[in-house]
Amino acid sequence: MVSSWRVQQAAQDIRAGAVIAYPTEAVWGLGCDPWDEEAVYRLLAIKSRPVEKGLILIADNIRQFDFLFEDFPQLWLDRMASTWPGPNTWLVPHQNLLPEWITGIHETVALRVTDHPTVRELCALVGPLISTSANPAGRPAARSRLRVEQYFRGQIDGVLGGSLGGRRNPSVIRDIATGQVMRAG
């Protein structure tokens, strides 16, 4: 279990523009403040990930995404609520409410309410976070803190310790309108 003090320090660092690594349900993640354009572009550069691909936003509860849901059908809200918190990512229309550095070239944005206790505590303090697997493009996702440090030594601002959530696969990604699985979990 990670101490609350360490989570609070990570939250403070993120608010100051840091890119950090942290454990998630299945693999280590990299994250930053989604509203900090400079931090997001730095994260993309660290991973060698094109901005056009878009990024996932994670939160500790569905209310952190309410600003996106104003005109959503009840069916969509029910779909998300029935799978969260948990390893389910939904592609939802962003309605031009999010910047391109989050959405890439897509009409949708990927959202997930995490059930990892450390990451939930972090999101409760800072709000939604960018979350992407901790690996350079084309390399396997980090499953240990050691691998994170090997991949990103000197490039990221910190590592929030802790254990992975025990899942073997990343979250399933589904389209909210159709329910179609875009990536198996």
From Swiss-Prot:
tRNA processing keyword on record: yes
Gene Ontology annotations of biological process type: regulation of translational fidelity; tRNA threonylcarbamoyladenosine modification
InterPro entries in alphabetical order: DHBP_synth_RibB-like_a/b_dom, Sua5-like_dom, TC-AMP_synthase, TC-AMP_synthase_SUA5
Protein's organism: Pseudomonas savastanoi pv. phaseolicola (strain 1448A / Race 6) (Pseudomonas syringae pv. phaseolicola (strain 1448A / Race 6))
Gene coding for it: tsaC
Domain YrdC-like: 4-185
Name recorded for this polypeptide: Threonylcarbamoyl-AMP synthase
UniProt family annotation: Belongs to the SUA5 family. TsaC subfamily.
Signal peptide: none
Gene3D superfamilies: DHBP synthase
Biological function: Required for the formation of a threonylcarbamoyl group on adenosine at position 37 (t(6)A37) in tRNAs that read codons beginning with adenine. Catalyzes the conversion of L-threonine, HCO(3)(-)/CO(2) and ATP to give threonylcarbamoyl-AMP (TC-AMP) as the acyladenylate intermediate, with the release of diphosphate.
